[in-house]
Swiss-Prot record:
Positions bound to Zn(2+) 1: H108, H110
EC number: 3.1.2.-
SMART domains: Lactamase_B
Protein name: Atrochrysone carboxyl ACP thioesterase MYCFIDRAFT_190111
Organism: Pseudocercospora fijiensis (strain CIRAD86)
Family membership noted in the UniProt record: Belongs to the metallo-beta-lactamase superfamily.
Length: 333
């Protein structure tokens, strides 16, 4: 998660499916009910978590940094947003425990995951050539899908899982059958995505790894990762069914196609606040429609510069019925 306006606690809007202003009050209330996370906590003998000290609207309690391994040499996953309190915690933790960092792995480019890199390099200059990220920036090292990073007691395998961002990587801790899920699966709530179809495919790829535990970049540890991923996929598939059902209702009323605004009204009703409709629901349903279009299940035509969506499945059903009627008439003649 990151912010286009430079607020390290925010989230960079990519498809505007979530809007900080529209959901400010809601998110504040949601955050107030989140469980407390200690600043530093040994989660397992191999995984130490340091909280990013960047709690915010879209970072939940803050971005989790994970220090992985059992010996002196260890690996860091994600670097928070570069808050002074975070780097002080990192420095104190490494010193007190006699830890040396050999690799820094970044799940993706968002500033609340990469912002601490300059401070790490300033304090530990040897890390300059050991910052790893998919689609790397200058002076960073590339990560390949399936690449292995190993230290004493920990073998980490990289897994390309785009959707939240194109460069998004997850990391599998082989010894624990656990996965660092980045922002794809959160400890609480649901992540925003760049591309819904790609995101759903990545969730399935993640599920196929059969990892038991999820270490999310935001929120608490996920004790049953397969159930969490399955629930997320089920929810997204339910949204697809809602959209297709709405288009079917329009067709039943004699309307072949419908605009995005009308589809949102069909699904959620008339009693919608305009900001909620315009800044959240319409962009989200538009993303679902684009995903369904990519699957060949819906299409649109432009009328007066406005996209009007229709179900290709309904079109095929109507065409098939018309063909049957024509065939029956031909036989009768």
């Amino acid at each position: 998660m990151a912010d286009q306006d430079g607020d390290k606690s925010g989230y960079r809007q990519i498809n505007k499916a979530l809007n900080i202003c529209a959901f400010d009050d809601y998110l504040k209330g949601q955050r107030a009910h989140l469980p407390q996370i200690p600043a530093v906590e040994q989660l397992t003998p191999r995984v130490l978590r340091v909280l990013g000290q960047n709690a915010g609207k879209f970072t939940l309690q803050g971005t989790n940094t994970f220090i992985v391994g059992k010996g002196r040499d260890r690996i860091i996953v994600d670097t928070s947003g570069g808050e002074e309190e975070w780097i002080e915690l990192i420095q104190e933790t490494l010193l007190d425990r006699g830890i040396n960092i050999t690799h820094v792995l970044l799940t993706h480019w968002h500033g609340d995951h990469t912002g601490g890199v300059p401070d790490l390099i300033r304090l530990y200059p040897h890390l300059k050539d050991h910052i790893y990220k998919n689609e790397p920036e200058r002076d960073q090292q590339a990560i390949q899908d399936g690449q292995i990073f190993a230290v004493q007691g920990a073998t980490i395998r990289a897994l390309h899982a785009p959707g939240h961002s194109t460069d998004h990587m997850c990391f599998i801790l082989e010894e624990e059958h656990a996965m660092f899920t980045g922002d794809n699966i959160l400890g609480h709530g649901t992540s925003a995505v760049e591309d819904l179809g790609t995101f759903m495919a990545s969730l399935q790829t993640m599920a196929d790894q059969n990892c038991k535990t999820g270490y999310s970049a935001h929120g608490v540890t996920i004790d049953n990762l397969p159930i969490k991923i399955s629930a997320e996929l089920t929810k997204l598939l339910r949204r697809e069914k809602q959209v297709l059902s709405a288009l079917a209702q329009f067709r039943k009323r004699g309307e072949r196609c419908a605009a995005l605004r009308d589809i949102v009204t069909e699904i959620y009703g008339q009693a919608l606040e305009e900001d909620t409709r315009r800044l959240a629901l319409e962009p989200f349903i538009d993303e679902v429609l684009r995903k369904l279009a990519g699957d060949g299940r819906v299409a649109f035509q432009k009328r007066g510069g406005l996209k009007k969506w229709y179900s290709l499945e309904m079109e095929m059903a109507v065409d098939a019925k018309a063909a049957q009627v024509a065939q029956a008439r031909a036989i009768a003649v």
